């Protein structure tokens, strides 16, 4: 039933306004933050956060971080990993020094052979390389350096 005044207005003039004599609505009656999830707030945690507490399964002591991790990049995308200034400096010009493209720094693990490379010698550092990619890089006058 709607009333004219709210509960707080009704309780004006009563010493503790419904909050008891001793604590008087002070401090942290249920503990701070998520305290008491296993004790006095258990029903709330069980209903709204099932599985919040406890462990599941077994620990793997000698877990290897994904040994098959090797995101791939194709030959036609190799020059996009290089900054624009470097690209303009080397592409289409005969220079004594070949640019080094470290594929691993860009987040790739393997170079695949799709697409064409410009006829500019380049040194490519990678963990894995396909046979066709290596052939095409050598055909363009470049070198593949395998790094750990």
From Swiss-Prot:
Task: Give one GO term, molecular function aspect.
Answer: structural constituent of ribosome
Q: Biased composition, Basic residues: where in the chain?
A: 1-13, 21-31
Is the keyword Cytoplasm assigned to this protein? Answer: yes
Matching Gene3D superfamilies, A to Z? 3.100.10.10
Q: List the disulfide bonds.
A: none
Keywords, sorted A to Z = Cytoplasm, Nucleus, Phosphoprotein, Ribonucleoprotein, Ribosomal protein
Which positions does the record annotate as the modified residue Phosphotyrosine? 108
Cellular component annotations (GO), alphabetically ordered: cytosol; cytosolic large ribosomal subunit; nucleolus; nucleus; preribosome
Q: Which domain of life is it from?
A: Eukaryota
Give the location in the cell.
Cytoplasm; Nucleus; Nucleus, Nucleolus
What the entry lists under PROSITE patterns is as follows:
RIBOSOMAL_L15
According to the UniProt record, where is the region Disordered?
1-38
The UniProt record lists the keyword Ligase = no
Q: What else is known?
A: There are 2 genes for uL15 in S.pombe.
Q: What is stated as this protein's family in its record? A: Belongs to the universal ribosomal protein uL15 family.
- Subunit structure comment from the entry: Component of the large ribosomal subunit (LSU). Mature yeast ribosomes consist of a small (40S) and a large (60S) subunit. The 40S small subunit contains 1 molecule of ribosomal RNA (18S rRNA) and at least 33 different proteins. The large 60S subunit contains 3 rRNA molecules (25S, 5.8S and 5S rRNA) and at least 46 different proteins.
Instruction: Return the protein name.
Output: Large ribosomal subunit protein uL15B
